[in-house]
């Protein structure tokens, strides 16, 4: 496995087992003092969208024990900003289908009462 793109950006707290339906969830804790927030944005930190897509990829790659590269983000919706000072524990719900060296993934990043990101796309297995 490759090392995370953003070192110390998050810590995975818990992950459910893969189900027969190719679904699982993972709960991660964002690090509100990570250096990325000094530029995005110093007064009110907001998790950058690209880092959230990377988070979806890294947690999924770890779960299936494969290296992945993003092939296509066919439908990505950023529905609300994640301020890690207000809510740093988030859950990622996955549904996926592996076909040869490609994975179709649908993932949602949510908090206690809100969905932050909806992702539908494809990853290549290296």
Please provide the spans of the model-predicted regions:
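Catalytic strand-loop segment that frames the active site of acyl-thioester-processing enzymes
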Residues: 4-47
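Compact, glycine-rich, soluble single-domain proteins
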Residues: 43-48, 52-53, 57
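HotDog/MaoC-like acyl-thioester-processing domains
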Residues: 23, 95-126
């Amino acid at each position: 496995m490759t090392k995370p793109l953003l070192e110390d950006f998050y810590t995975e707290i818990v992950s459910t087992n893969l189900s027969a339906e190719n679904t699982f969830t993972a709960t991660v804790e964002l690090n509100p003092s990570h250096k990325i927030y000094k530029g995005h944005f110093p007064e009110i930190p907001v998790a950058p969208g690209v880092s959230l897509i990377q988070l979806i990829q890294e947690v999924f790659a770890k779960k299936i024990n494969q290296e992945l590269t993003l092939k296509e983000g066919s439908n990505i919706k950023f529905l609300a900003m994640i301020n890690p000072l207000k809510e740093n524990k988030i859950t990622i719900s996955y549904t996926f289908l592996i076909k040869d060296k490609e994975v179709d993934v649908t993932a949602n990043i949510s908090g206690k009462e809100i969905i932050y990101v909806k992702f539908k796309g494809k990853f290549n297995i290296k």
